[in-house]
Amino acid sequence: MDEVAAYQAAHPKNKEHFIAENQLEDKPIIALLAGSRKQEIKDNLPDMLKAASAFPDYQLVLAGAPAIAPEYYKQYVGEAKVKIIFDQTYSLLQHADVALVTSGTATLETALFRVPQVVCYYTPIGKVVSFLRRHILTVRFISLVNLIADREVVKELVADTMTVKNMQNELRNIIENEAYRNEMLSGY
């Protein structure tokens, strides 16, 4: 938390500079934080891109993980219209309007930057994970935001519930429903 506060104090918000520096369009931003490990990126990024691409009034900006080579992303990006930026995750969050975020510390960082988000986490053994979550595991949430609040502040689409349609519905709800968006932000 201190790291985010220090960043915000040292880097006043300047969207025009961020757009120019990264050759972005002057459009609202859907930030994509697809994880920091190759398997997470492989499992999550393709559907995140499909879901976010349904919003043509927004531009897609992907936070590249520092330990992942730019070439690795190319196999999953395909023809999607997305800009990949590295070493600027906090700047991206500072200027994002909404985010799709793979579960992990990034969910808490996204909340600290007050960006409405959908938490996404797919696993190839989704049905098994869903069964375990419903019948065996006692942890109700996977995102740090919800775990800390001990209630659902942000929607978690995990395993078999992480579908393109569900992500699109949740993004649409955040974008179009101001009361829903504000309720999420007040939960931060």
Q: Model regions: which residues?
A:
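Nucleotide-activated sugar donor-binding and catalytic core shared by glycosyltransferases
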Residues: 1-188
